[in-house]
């Protein structure tokens, strides 16, 4: 047992010389491991008389405890030194400019909606909204679309039941506004609409913008002038515009509006017309006193024409390579 002090001294010296945690662990194994120098001292107890073994065992355990405490202290010192060294290497130069956060960008359809709202806002139009789950009265009946009209067919409309559907147009917003507000009325109604169609130029969900004016002495001339100014503003050029006679149940007379494309061909951009007298009567407005015009346009189609996009579905595929072009 006399050489225990020497083993402890040797272990302490080795501990102090360990330059890293790995070397320190080797010292631990050498002295305190299963076959370590101090651990093997316990096997010498069987050579002693039984009455001396407890005292001798206590001395060995005390020696092991001294070495373990030295190991713990040295490990703490080595870990602190390693941490300080790493912190010194990773010091942040606060004088350097920070990393620039990449700015997001508006979706091209959102850009179109904002641009149109801005234009009509300057003309005194206010933005009105309504529910996307609509009833057949506001989506069809009040708009002079009777039960036998093809637009009410299952293959064109997403029906929940006999009376509820996903709105096929934002015209229901016009009906609600005219019921709640007395003329003069001047609104635009942007929003999502739903139709059972999917191809290169159609998707089951798309964005529509409708406009409505109801007042005294509103004429088709007012309609033409408003839309002509809008199209020139939106496309930022003096366009050749054509109003082509058409049919919509809720307007009379009705027209589709075309602009001359760069390829020399007419391109349809929106539909419009004078509010049908039956629609005015349905909302309690006297068509003998008031008149109005309405127009509607697809936001995706206008965006395609403005930016030269050929496939409408690209707006909904979330391809960043496509969307980043519009930042």
From Swiss-Prot:
What molecular function does GO assign, one term?
A: magnesium ion binding
Top-level taxon of the source organism: Bacteria
Name of one Pfam family that matches: tRNA-synt_2d
Report if keyword Transit peptide is assigned. Answer: no
Which reaction equation describes what this protein catalyses? tRNA(Phe) + L-phenylalanine + ATP = L-phenylalanyl-tRNA(Phe) + AMP + diphosphate + H(+)
Entry-linked InterPro entries: aa-tRNA-synth_II, aa-tRNA-synth_II/BPL/LPL, Phe-tRNA-synth_IIc_asu, Phe-tRNA_ligase_II_N, Phe_tRNA_ligase_alpha1_bac, Phenylalanyl-tRNA_Synthase, tRNA-bd_arm
One cellular component term (GO) for this entry is: cytoplasm
Q: Which UniProt keywords apply?
A: Aminoacyl-tRNA synthetase, ATP-binding, Cytoplasm, Ligase, Magnesium, Metal-binding, Nucleotide-binding, Protein biosynthesis
Any single biological process term in GO: phenylalanyl-tRNA aminoacylation
**Obligatory cofactor(s):** Mg(2+)
Tell me which Gene3D superfamilies the record gives. Answer: Bira Bifunctional Protein, Domain 2 (3.30.930.10)
Q: What's the Enzyme Commission number for this chain?
A: 6.1.1.20
Q: Which residues bind Mg(2+)?
A: 252
UniProt KW Magnesium keyword: yes
State the SUPFAM superfamilies in the record: Class II aaRS and biotin synthetases (SSF55681), tRNA-binding arm (SSF46589)
Q: Cellular location of this protein?
A: Cytoplasm
Q: How is the cofactor bound?
A: Binds 2 magnesium ions per tetramer.
HAMAP family per the record?
Phe_tRNA_synth_alpha1 (MF_00281)
Similarity annotation: Belongs to the class-II aminoacyl-tRNA synthetase family. Phe-tRNA synthetase alpha subunit type 1 subfamily.
Subunit-structure text: Tetramer of two alpha and two beta subunits.
Q: What is this protein called?
A: Phenylalanine--tRNA ligase alpha subunit
